[in-house]
Regions:
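Glycine-rich FAD pyrophosphate-binding loop
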Residues: 20-41
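Active-site substrate-recognition segment that forms the wall
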Residues: 14-18, 22, 46, 75-79, ...
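Conserved Rossmann-like nucleotide-cofactor binding loop
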Residues: 11, 34, 178
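N-terminal Rossmann-like FAD-binding beta1-loop-alpha1 element of flavoenzymes
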Residues: 2-27
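Short phosphate-binding/catalytic loops that engage adenosine nucleotides
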Residues: 24, 108, 152
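Predominantly flavin-linked oxidoreductase catalytic cores and closely associated redox partners
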Residues: 134-192
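Dinucleotide-binding Rossmann-like beta1-alpha1 core, especially the glycine-rich loop
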Residues: 43-125
Length: 192
């Protein structure tokens, strides 16, 4: 089976590597000049689930996957000083009480705190958590090494509209903000 993975961010690279390890013929296609250039530098957190207080399924998945991420890419992770999550008194779609109840239910550890430089009059609840960060340059290099050792065919500087997609048995879109543009180029339709 020949597979195209479109988008060489961390997810696209990881998917391509795992499919290649499973014995599939994989082309990893990226329009930029290098892997992980667009979104990798934005978050810098190996999300452990705290961000998703209104979605227990996502919270659980993130918590599980952050542990897998640590095993898979240990050289790019480091323990950062402090990570805070804050629920505002007004305008939030979840209350502090609901948020803490969800964290307790799914056993995500936290410590209630006051956050420096944040006016406590606007805060329903603030917590400090232990959550790893990643260095985007170290992560990029770690992934680059894995790709070079693999059988993944990395195709850079290539727009999806330039590719003969009928040659692929499966096409996986991993383009983040570009998902609809990629889908439209391949199928003529946007992702719903």
């Amino acid at each position: 089976m020949k597979i195209a993975v479109i988008g060489a961010g961390i997810y696209g690279c990881h998917i391509a590597l795992k499919l290649s390890e499973a014995g599939f013929n994989v082309d990893l296609i990226e329009r930029e000049s290098d892997i992980m250039k667009i979104t990798t530098d934005i978050s810098l957190r190996a999300h452990s689930g705290y961000f998703y207080g209104r979605s227990p399924e996502t919270m659980i998945a993130c918590n599980k996957n952050s542990k897998l991420f640590l095993k898979e890419y240990p050289n790019s992770l480091f323990d950062h000083d402090k990570h805070y999550y804050i629920i505002a008194k007004n305008g939030s779609k979840i209350t502090g009480k609901e948020y803490l109840a969800t964290l307790d239910k799914y056993k995500l550890p936290y410590k209630k705190t006051k956050v420096p430089l944040i006016n406590p009059d606007f805060v329903d609840v603030a917590i400090e958590v232990e959550e790893l960060s990643y260095d985007p340059n170290l992560l990029r290099e770690e992934v680059r090494i894995k790709l070079k050792k693999s059988k993944v065919n990395l195709i850079l500087n290539t727009d999806v509209s330039d590719l003969p997609f009928r040659e692929y048995d499966l096409r996986i879109i991993s383009g983040y903000a570009s998902n609809n543009d990629i889908s439209r180029a391949i199928t003529g339709k946007t992702i719903q």
